[in-house]
Regions:
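Bacterial Sec-type N-terminal signal peptides, specifically the leucine/valine-rich hydrophobic h-region
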Residues: 17-20
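Compositionally biased intrinsically disordered regions enriched in Thr/Gly
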Residues: 2-11, 23-152, 156-258
Length: 258
């Protein structure tokens, strides 16, 4: 059974990590390594007033998850946070672990491996936390080349709940159309070039499922092959929030842009 070690304070593991350990037929470890990055700031003086998410510090950490299901072998670092509002921290961490579990569960019936390619707590804002996980999928035995798989998590730090496209856009079709239009405007300036694959930006939830909330805008991460050939790598565009002003939920606009 896979073991799990955390540096710093102990953290209860969610069911997805327990499932990884339970089905593993190899020894493995999961290790969290706190970084030195601290965002936001705690109050300088004691107070008896209720503490808001904005006054609590969140520290970026990481967790190494290793093991095997028999069909899938994985050794992946996932982004995590510590500190702050425990409900927000728990929601973000569980969501990132669930994102990895989805990648382990959701790729056909053939044997494969998953390894780390990129992981980060991409943005910790006053009201929102965004996380990025990119793993490297490879056939087992290895095929022609690995394929990156993208996952993102966006959590409302005021309510400790994930923010979905349906939450962000009250009129979802209108929101998706705006994302499609803006992507068509922005993609020619990326490595995808003017001949980008247009089916990859059709106004569907699947095409815009991977996004991060940043102060600059809605950072959209396209999957491998989605808007161009494998050779160009993963492509991202950032749609400014003001370009989405007519379709975004007014109550969420200050949250995602914080």
């Amino acid at each position: 059974m896979s073991g799990i070690r955390r540096s710093g304070r102990a953290v209860a593991l969610v069911a997805v990590v327990l499932a990884l350990a339970a089905c593993s037929d190899q020894a493995g470890t999961a290790v969290s390594e706190p970084s030195t990055t601290t965002t936001a700031s705690a109050a300088d003086t004691p107070t008896t007033e209720a503490t808001t998410s904005a006054s609590l510090p969140y520290n970026e950490t990481e967790l190494q998850v290793t093991g095997s299901t028999g069909r899938v072998r994985y050794d992946v670092l996932i982004p995590q946070i510590e500190g702050g509002n425990p409900a927000v921290t728990g929601e973000f961490n569980e969501s990132m672990r669930a994102a990895l579990q989805d990648q382990i569960d959701g790729w056909g019936t053939d044997a494969f491996t998953l390894s780390s390619q990129e992981h980060s707590v991409a943005h910790i804002g006053e009201h929102v936390i965004s996380g990025l996980l990119v793993t490297s999928w490879n056939a087992d035995p290895p095929g022609a080349h690995p394929t990156p798989i993208v996952a993102t998590v966006v959590v409302n730090a005021d309510t400790a709940t994930p923010i979905t496209l349906g939450d962000l856009f009250p009129d979802l079709p209108a929101g998706l159309q705006a994302l499609s239009d803006e992507s068509a405007r922005l993609l020619p300036a990326t490595v995808a070039g003017p001949d980008f694959e247009r089916s990859g930006i059709e106004p569907t939830e699947a095409n815009f499922a991977n996004w991060l909330a940043t102060p600059a805008g809605m950072e959209i991460h396209f999957n491998d092959y989605q808007v161009g050939p494998h050779a160009v790598g993963l492509v991202t565009v950032t749609v400014p929030w003001d370009a989405l002003a007519d379709v975004i939920d007014p109550a969420l606009a200050p949250v995602v842009s914080s």
